[in-house]
């Protein structure tokens, strides 16, 4: 039996955001991950982090590094620069080689699909910047400041673009000692906590504006799978199931977005155990769009944990059920919270949140 090996190649695109090609070598069935795979994945992430750090001068390292247990871990937001002040290493201040090293680190930390999602979100913000500089267009951003999220910056206008994303290390990258990789900007917050062979990428916020745009002749929808899979599920329910799933009130925004750590929502909607096996599969596929952003080695056991709570997992819906309409949905279980919330009835401006109420910031394995 021949194995399939995947190589991730990262290069800078014309816009300055790294592009990724996934090259398949060999053919046949992929072998299951070894028992050492999580530790090996952590080692690759740490190696990429160390390689980046070695490229920085003293000032750059000072911007990058924060205490592990300090206040920086909760300083993340969906808001753009000029409204929310981020700290860390700003992509726009880096050389091309340093920027490529940041994107190589993200490629190591994320799955191929997760990496593409992050790049597509960043490119979407570059679309906003270009439209801002030319006076707008279909993808202009009149409501970009909407949403909760931390301290404002000191005056100035709102700034979009793929330069406005920041990287921070909380603690020192290590294969044994807990540390955290934080990466974010407008409509993106990745909080990845690593402790040896354990990893948690919660809370995280992948969002999109514009939700659809054109890049190099192709249509890009950063959250298109999430949207389409959810509408497919709600329309696969029978009348009785829909009555249970659809909330009797409108949800206009994320309930547990930025700044809402430690809070909970009363479960609502239809229990996953009331779904047919095929409908359950559809729901898990939706959840995997968020859980599967991080490196696959860590995402697979995370999805197994989520599935194990079938009887206590709920799917809730608020809004129209025709695809192309602005509708909120939520998947919630003992170790899972996913929310998807179009902003101000716009299908072109989407916020989402992904949490584990038992393990945000890796609480289970770092003891904080």
What is each residue range found by the language model?
Residues 1-6:
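Positively charged n-region of N-terminal signal peptides that target proteins for export
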Residues 7-18:
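Bacterial N-terminal signal peptides
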Residues 22-107, 111-368:
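A cross-kingdom marker for long, charged
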């Amino acid at each position: 039996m021949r194995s399939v090996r995947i190589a991730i190649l990262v290069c800078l695109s014309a816009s300055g955001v790294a592009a990724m090609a996934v090259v398949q070598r060999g053919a046949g069935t992929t072998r299951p991950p070894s028992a050492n795979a999580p530790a090996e994945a952590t080692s690759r992430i740490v190696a990429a982090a160390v390689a980046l750090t070695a490229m920085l001068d003293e000032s750059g390292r000072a911007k990058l590094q924060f205490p592990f247990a300090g206040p920086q871990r909760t300083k993340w937001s969906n808001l753009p620069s000029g409204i929310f002040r981020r700290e860390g290493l700003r992509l726009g201040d880096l050389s091309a080689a340093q920027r490529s090293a940041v994107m190589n680190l993200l490629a190591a930390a994320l799955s191929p699909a997760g990496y593409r999602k992050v790049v597509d979100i960043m490119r979407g913000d570059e679309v906003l910047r270009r439209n801002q500089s030319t006076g707008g267009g279909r993808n202009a951003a009149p409501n970009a400041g909407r949403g909760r999220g931390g301290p404002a910056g000191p005056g100035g206008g709102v700034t979009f673009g793929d330069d406005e994303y920041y990287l921070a290390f909380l603690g020192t990258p290590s294969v044994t000692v807990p540390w955290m990789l934080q990466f974010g900007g407008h409509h993106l917050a990745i909080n990845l906590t690593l402790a040896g062979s354990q990893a948690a990428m919660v809370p995280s916020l992948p969002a999109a504006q514009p939700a659809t745009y054109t890049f190099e002749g192709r249509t890009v929808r950063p959250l298109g799978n999430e949207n389409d899979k959810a509408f497919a599920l709600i329309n696969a329910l029978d009348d009785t199931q829909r009555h249970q799933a659809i909330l009797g009130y409108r949800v206009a925004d994320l309930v547990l977005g930025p700044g809402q750590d430690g809070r909970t929502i009363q479960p609502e909607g239809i229990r996953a155990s009331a779904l047919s096996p095929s409908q359950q599969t559809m729901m898990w596929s939706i959840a995997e769009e968020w859980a599967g952003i991080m490196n696959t080695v860590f995402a697979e056991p995370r999805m197994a944990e989520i599935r194990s709570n079938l009887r206590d997992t709920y799917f809730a819906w608020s809004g129209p059920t025709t695809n192309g309409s602005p509708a909120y949905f939520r998947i919630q279980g003992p170790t899972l919270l996913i929310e998807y919330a179009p902003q101000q009835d716009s299908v072109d401006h989407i916020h989402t949140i992904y949490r584990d109420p038992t393990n945000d910031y890796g609480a289970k394995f770092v003891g904080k």
